[in-house]
Amino acid sequence: MSFKTTKWTILTLLLASFLLVSTAAFAGTPKETSEEAPEYVELVFSDWHLAEPHWEKALKEAFVIFEREHPNIKIKLDVVSYGEKETKYTTEIEAGVGPDVFHLHAYSIKSFIEKGYVYDMTPFVKAEGPGFTDAWYSQTIELMKKDGKYFAMPGDFMAMVLYYNKNLYREAGLDPARPPKTWDEFLEYAKKLTRDRDGDGKIDTWGFGTIGAIDPGFELRFTPILFSHGGSYLSKDNKCSALNTSEAMEAMKFFNDLVTVHKVVPPGVTAQNPGTVRQQMANEQIAMLLGSGWTPPIVDNNNPDLNALDVLEAAAVPVKAGTSPKFSTTAWLSAWMISPNTKHPEEAWELVKFITSKSMEEKWFKDARVLSSRKDVSGEYDELLSDKFAKIIAAELDHAKFVPQLKEWPQIIEAINTAAQESFTGAKSPKRALEDAHDRINGILSVYRTSSDKCPGF
C-alpha cells in the first residue's frame, strides 16, 4: 500500500470516528435535558401563627408533607404579627409585591375584596367540581364571596367563651364546677379573685384580664359583652350606629367599670393586647379572660409549669341577669387568601386547598386546638368532639353572631376601641367617649345613606 493511500485511509477513519462521537453526543442531548431537575416554584406564605411556637411547628410539619406531594413547589415563610398583618399586606400589595398566600381575620375580607387586594379563586373552586364547598358551614362560605365569586376560603371558626383557672377559683372559695352565668355573678367572682396571694399586702392576682390597647383583638373581647347585654353595633340596615341604645351604653359602662371602678383588671390595661393578656393568665396574674380554641395551647406554651390544659376550664359567656339574648357571643372566623400579585396562582390555589383540607384541619385542631369551618371536622372529628374546651366552643356557635360585614368595619371597631381607651384613662367619661364614637361611626356610614335617611341622636 502506498503512503498516499495509507494517509487517506487514516484520515477517513478519523473523520468517521469524529462523526460517530458527535452523533452519539447529539443524540444523547434530549435524554440529558429530560433528566434535569424541574424548575421550582417558590410560594411565599404569610401568617401571624408563625410567631407562635406550637403553630409554627404544626405549619412546618404540614409544609414538609405539601412539598413532598408537590415536588415542584417550595414554601418560603413570612412572619407577621397579628396586629400588623393588615398594614403589612396592604402596603405590600399596593407596591405590587407581598406574599402569595396569606391569612386574615374575616372582618378584613370585605375591605380587601373592595380594594382589589385578593385574587379571584372562582375558576379554581368551580374546577373542583359540584359540591366542593358543601363540606363547609354555609355561613362561613358566604362570607368569602362577593357577587357570586369566591375570593377566599374559610379557616378557623370558633365562638368566644369564658376561660378560667380552676385552682384560683378554689383558692378564692369558688366552685370551679359553677362558673358565672350572669354578669352580676361574674363581677362577684372577679372581686373575690382579685386578691393578695403572696401575703405582701399588695394585690397580685386580678379577677379578669382584657385588652385596652388599640388592637384588632379588641373586637373579640368587647363584642361578647355587648351582645350578651342585648346590644348591637349598628342598625339593622347597617346605615347608622346603634351605640346610642341603652343596651350598648350599659355594656360599655360595665366594661369600663371593671377597670376604673371595681379594679378587677390589672393596672395598665391600655397597653394590653391579646398576647400580653394570655401571658397574664399563664403567670396566674388573672383568673379569667375571654378567648377561644387558641387560648389553652398558647397559655400552656407560655408557662408549661401551669399545666394549662388541665388547670383551665371553659364556659359560656355570661349574660345580663334576667335576659336570654339570642346571641350572647361573637364568632371568630379566619380566611385564606391569594394575592393578586402572585405569579403562580395555580400553585397558590394548591396550597390554599391543602391548608383547608379535611386532614389538615384535623391537624390544626390536634396541634393548636382551633375548630374548623369544615362541618366534616368540627361536627365529626372524634378528638374534637371529646375535648373539654372544644365541645363548649362548638355548643356556643349557636349563640354566636358575626360583627357587621362591611368594608368600613376596621374603621368602625377602631372608633369603639378608642372610646374604650378614652374611658379607661379618664380622658373622657364612658358616655362622652361612646357618644363621640357614635358620631364618628355615623360619619363613616354616611356613604350608605340618602338625604332622607336620618340617624337617631345619642
Provide a role label for each language-model segment:
Residues 64, 68-69, 74, 172, ...:
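Extracytoplasmic/periplasmic substrate-recognition and gating elements
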Residues 139, 143, 312-317, 365-418, ...:
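Long, aromatic- and glycine/proline-rich binding clefts that accommodate carbohydrate-like moieties
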Residues 29, 81, 106-161, 187, ...:
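Hinge/lid segment of periplasmic solute-binding proteins
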Residues 83-120, 132-152, 162-163, 168, ...:
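Pocket-flanking alpha-helical
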Residues 2-11, 23-117, 126-134, 176, ...:
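Conserved N-terminal structural module of periplasmic/extracytoplasmic solute-binding proteins
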Residues 119-136, 179, 198-199, 206-215, ...:
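Short, solvent-exposed loop/beta-turn-alpha elements that line the ligand-binding surface or hinge
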Residues 187-192, 237-269, 313, 317-320:
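Glycine-centered hinge/linker elements that transmit conformational signals in sensory
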Residues 160-164, 226, 336-338:
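Short glycine- and hydrophobic/aromatic-rich loop-to-beta-strand nucleating segment
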